[in-house]
Amino acid sequence: MMLEHILVLSAYLFSIGIYGLITSRNMVRALMCLELIFNSVNINFVTFSGFFDNRQLRGDIFSVFVFAIAAAEAAIGLAIVSSIYRNRKSTRINQSNLLNK
């Protein structure tokens, strides 16, 4: 596959993630869009690592760390959303102002 095709795919996924993050009102959907953004960045890391084939540019190793951070972010984010849902009975972003209590 050509480099341009992969970069266009990654830019498309990144754009979908940004659009979903801006327009979503549900916390779980916002977390999913954030994961989509992380995955599009990982696609870029792996693509450039394979394209340049340089010993100092190791995007595939860095993408493993990004996957680990994204997994931790998803676990913590879902725990926070679960706690907010137990207390507020809603996962809507505009209804979860925790400072007004």
From Swiss-Prot:
GO terms for molecular function: oxidoreductase activity, acting on NAD(P)H, quinone or similar compound as acceptor; quinone binding. It is found in: Plastid, Chloroplast thylakoid membrane. Keywords: Chloroplast, Membrane, NAD, NADP, Plastid, Plastoquinone, Quinone, Thylakoid, Translocase, Transmembrane, Transmembrane helix, Transport. The chain crosses the membrane at residues 2-22, 32-52, 61-81. It holds the Pfam family Oxidored_q2. GO terms for biological process: ATP synthesis coupled electron transport; photosynthesis, light reaction. Disulfide bonds: none annotated. InterPro entries: NADH_UbQ_OxRdtase_chain4L/K (IPR001133), NUOK/Mnh_C1-like (IPR039428). It is a multi-pass membrane protein. It catalyses: a plastoquinone + NADH + (n+1) H(+)(in) = a plastoquinol + NAD(+) + n H(+)(out); a plastoquinone + NADPH + (n+1) H(+)(in) = a plastoquinol + NADP(+) + n H(+)(out). It comes from the Eukaryota. Its EC number is 7.1.1.-. GO terms for cellular component: chloroplast thylakoid membrane; NADH dehydrogenase complex. It is an enzyme of class 7 (translocase). NDH is composed of at least 16 different subunits, 5 of which are encoded in the nucleus. NDH shuttles electrons from NAD(P)H:plastoquinone, via FMN and iron-sulfur (Fe-S) centers, to quinones in the photosynthetic chain and possibly in a chloroplast respiratory chain. The immediate electron acceptor for the enzyme in this species is believed to be plastoquinone. Couples the redox reaction to proton translocation, and thus conserves the redox energy in a proton gradient. HAMAP family: NDH1_NuoK. Belongs to the complex I subunit 4L family. NCBIfam families: PRK05715.1-2 (NF004320), PRK05715.1-4 (NF004322), PRK05715.1-5 (NF004323). This is NAD(P)H-quinone oxidoreductase subunit 4L, chloroplastic. It comes from Jasminum nudiflorum.
